[in-house]
């Protein structure tokens, strides 16, 4: 079909520490080096390193009398991962899907589009870290999350 474009990508990642004996210990994990209070993370999966990630995008463009109409949608799947450098189980992120879409019109000078990101309103841990208080007492976890469902209109004028 004229004006129809597909793009697809797959990533497989097997990322592990070969040797990392000075890793951070999460609260409740017994340090392997009691003097330095570090843990041996050798053989563990790296943080923020999902085994699988795949993207699929579809775009359709159609010539109109006054410009070009277009529609685009993107889908991303990411397998489970841990977002904490010490691999704290509280920072485990389950596999998730993200979906976005855009509908618009453009010509050489003007464009307008209606768009939406994270349309399924998926909550994803993007980073995490332990919070400790005096004496190494567990103060809980601090989580950073992705943006919730967002949508809007974008208008452009090119000079």
Segments from the language model and where they lie:
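C-terminal beta-signal and adjacent terminal beta-strands/loops
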Residues: 2, 76-84, 105-159
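Generic structural signal for short, flexible, solvent-exposed coil/loop and linker residues
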Residues: 35, 43, 85-88, 99, ...
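Outer-membrane beta-barrel proteins
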Residues: 89-93
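Short, basic/aromatic-rich helical patch in the C-terminal catalytic core of site-specific tyrosine
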Residues: 101-103
């Amino acid at each position: 079909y004229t004006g129809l474009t597909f793009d697809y990508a797959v990533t497989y990642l097997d990322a592990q520490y070969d040797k990392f004996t000075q890793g951070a210990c999460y609260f409740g994990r017994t340090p392997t080096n009691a003097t330095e209070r570090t843990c041996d993370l050798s053989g563990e999966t790296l943080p923020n390193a999902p085994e699988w990630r795949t993207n699929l995008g579809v775009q359709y463009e159609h010539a109109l009398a006054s410009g070009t109409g277009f529609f685009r949608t993107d889908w991303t799947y990411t397998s489970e991962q841990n977002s904490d450098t010490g691999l704290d189980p509280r920072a485990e992120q389950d596999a998730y899907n993200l979906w976005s879409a855009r509908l618009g019109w453009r010509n050489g000078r003007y464009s307008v589009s209606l768009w939406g990101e994270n349309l399924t309103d998926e909550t994803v841990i993007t980073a995490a870290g332990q919070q400790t208080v005096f004496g190494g007492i567990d103060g809980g976890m601090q989580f950073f999350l992705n943006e919730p469902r967002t949508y809007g209109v974008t208008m452009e004028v090119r000079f």
